[in-house]
């Protein structure tokens, strides 16, 4: 058998064998997959799922979250300002917080909707021009603004390393930045490198193709 549940359980076993110091949460990246395809994993009892487009997530998960209030949705893609209200309504975690305008919009809608999401600050640790994320040199000031000025709940940092390079040095750097801010969680590692990410302290890994297969 090679169902999505089988593949998920194999990943869980691999993670357990690493004996991580902290609990590692597997975010099943369900973006682009129909709910009918994902359902066996929900029925298996898995609760953490990731999406990168707000509109797709609304269509897929709004009713499902009413049925199962224990589901936890993670926004892992770039969040546009005009989608923030809907995102705050639906999601439990945002992994792509990286600028003051977005932070202000989230804080405003959280207050209006009486929500308190958990957030990761995305760091552009590879200094890639085309990639989202706050520059390392601006991280401390942005973190302090989010926490002390607008009362966002920042639980950790997030990184997507440059594709063409080995991720280890970026994972190590993010771990050090995370410790410097005394944060408990790290969002890093995907299907190709989640094992390495966990070795460097990741507590949330974002796994898609290793569970669901290739996207058409």
Where in the sequence are the language-model features?
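Conserved alpha/beta-domain cores
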Residues: 1-185, 190-192, 198-200
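Expand to "…catalyze enediolate/carbanion chemistry for C-C bond making/breaking, isomerization
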Residues: 198, 211-216
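Divalent-metal-activated hydrolytic enzyme cores
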Residues: 203-204
